[in-house]
Structures are given as C-alpha cells and as structure tokens.
UniProtKB/Swiss-Prot annotation:
Gene: CXXC5
Cellular component GO terms held in the UniProt record: cytosol; nucleoplasm; nucleus
Principal cellular location given in the protein's record: nucleus
UniProt-annotated binding residues for Zn(2+) 1: 258, 261, 264, 291
Organism (species): Bos taurus
Name of the protein described by the UniProt record: CXXC-type zinc finger protein 5
C-alpha cells in the first residue's frame, strides 16, 4: 500500500515538479523573447535615426534616399472610416450617398448657370435699351438746340429789319426836302432827293442815311471827297453863305486831279511845251499832263457834283 501510495505521490510530485518547472521556465522564456525583440528593434531604430549615406552618381550629384514618410506610407484603405472587414455593404452605401451628393451638386450648379445666363441676358438687354434711350435723348436735345438756334436767328433778323425800318422813318422825317427849303435849288435836284429816298441807288446801304454819293470821287489812287461838294450840306439852310463859300473855295483852293484821264496817267514831262521851257517864270505843269477835269470851270464841277443820286460819277462817262 505504501508503495502504491508512494507511487502516486511520486507521480504527483513529478507532475507538480514538472509543472512547476514548466511554469518556472515559462516566464524566463518570455523575458528572453522580449529582450530579443528589443535588441532587434533597437538596431532598426538606430538605423532609421542614423543619417543615410550620401550616394553620388557619375556626375557627382547627390542622390538622396526617399523620405521616411514616403517609405512608411500606408494604403488608402487604412485611412477609410469603414474597415476592410467592415464590409462591402458600408462601402456601397458610402458610394451611393456620394453619388447622390455629386448629382445634387451638379444639378445646383446647372441651375445656377441657367440663372446666371438669364441675368446676363437681362443685363445686356438693359444696357442696350439704356444705350438706345441715351441716343434718342441726345438726338432730341440736338433737335431742340437746332430749333432754338433757328428761332434765335429769325428773331435777330426780325429785330434787324425793324431797326432798319425805324431808321428809314426817322431819316425821312428829319431830312429837309429840297422843295420845302426853297433855297433856290432847281426842281431837278428836289426830284433827285425824292428818288434817293424812295428808289434804288448805286449805294443800297446808304439809302437810309442823308449822304449823297455824288460827294465821293473814285480814282485808282483811292476814294476822295469832292472839295466843292463839302459845302452842299449848308446850301439848304444857308444859301448865301454856301454860295460865298463855294466861290471862295473855287478861287483860292487848289483842285485835285481826277487820276483817270490820259494826262493824269502820264508820269514824265514832255520837256518841249512852253510850260516845260519856261518853268522858272510860270511854274506851270506840262501841258500834256494837265487834267481834263481841271481845264473846266469850277462852276461846272459844282453842277456835276449836284447830279441826281442814281447818276453819280457821270463825269467819268
């Protein structure tokens, strides 16, 4: 019995010892495995932290290795919210939702595009309508300005015509007629004065002014005023003084040359006539240079000045 009992005890002791041995050897093996793993990981980390060796190609350019982040890159499935084993059902749901969102975004963009096109068309139509309205307004303003200018021109012409009519009336009222003066002038001159007031003359712009065109003598050298006609204005009011003044002026004052006849146009003396030979005694002009009008009497010159207005400058004919 003892042997039999010892047998199981031995067997149990051996089993317990073996179990203890195994249990005791188990922690040791785990520690050894951990130390081996740490030893294996340490060189790898050291190798990662150590600067990579420089590699140069044939031309001497340094070719650096890839970055650590690129070497440790992970696939896209690692960053997805649904795991790979989490199912293809979740992926299909996500794909359907994204497709619906993309379709809705495309539809909204299309609607916005249509709205933008419609707004641009409205803006263009508004701009064209504004341009047309501005052009019409400018044309209307130009037309109004033209009508205003035309009205102003007509008004100025009417005022000018009225002023000329008033001036003519004033001259007719204040100009003493030859017949009313009774100063001894012939009836022909009174008729000439009436013609000057009522009819056309050689000087249309002087018809409203009491100026006789016969007072002016036209020559190639210029326009001169007749000396004997200077006293015509005083003949009507002071006839005796006018006659005396004309007699004195014709006797003492020197008359001018006409400048139109052939003797007046000559510039050189003949040196053959008596006037040229006796220049010291007579102080006369060359006979071939004497004016034909100066050869006539002063009274004849006065009569020619008193010609009617319409027949002015008749002595040149």
């Amino acid at each position: 019995m003892s042997s039999l009992s010892s047998g199981p005890q031995d067997t149990g002791g051996s089993s317990s010892s073996s179990s203890n041995g195994s249990s005791g050897s188990g922690p040791k093996a785990g520690v050894a495995d951990k130390s081996a793993a740490v030893a294996a990981a340490a060189p790898a980390s050291v190798a990662d932290d150590a600067p990579p060796p420089e590699r140069r190609n044939k031309s001497g350019i340094i070719s650096e290795p890839l970055n650590k982040s690129l070497r440790r890159s992970r696939p896209l499935s690692h960053y997805s919210s649904f795991g790979g084993s989490g199912g293809s059902g979740g992926g299909s749901m996500m794909g359907g939702e994204s497709a619906e969102k993309a379709a809705a975004a495309a539809a909204s963009l299309l609607a916005n595009g249509h709205d933008l096109a419609a707004a641009m068309a409205v803006d263009k139509s508004n701009s064209t309508s504004k341009h047309k309205s501005s052009a019409v307004a400018s044309l209307l303003s130009k037309a109004e300005r033209a009508t205003e200018l035309g009205a102003e021109g007509q008004l100025t012409l009417q005022q000018f015509a009225q002023s000329t009519e008033m001036l003519k009336r004033v001259v007719q009222e204040h100009l003493p007629l030859m017949s009313e003066a009774g100063a001894g002038l012939p009836d022909m001159e009174a008729v000439a004065g009436a013609e000057a007031l009522n009819g056309q003359s050689d000087f249309p712009y002087l018809g409203a002014f009491p100026i006789n065109p016969g007072l002016f003598i036209m020559t190639p050298a210029g326009v001169f005023l007749a000396e004997s006609a200077l006293h015509m204005a005083g003949l009507a009011e002071y006839p005796m003084q006018g006659e005396l003044a004309s007699a004195i002026s014709s006797g003492k004052k020197k008359r001018k040359r006409c400048g139109m006849c052939a003797p007046c146009r000559r510039r050189i003396n003949c040196e053959q006539c008596s006037s040229c030979r006796n220049r010291k005694t007579g102080h006369q002009i060359c006979k071939f240079r004497k004016c034909e009008e100066l050869k006539k009497k002063p009274s004849a010159a006065l009569e020619k000045v008193m010609l009617p207005t319409g027949a002015a400058f008749r002595w040149f004919q």
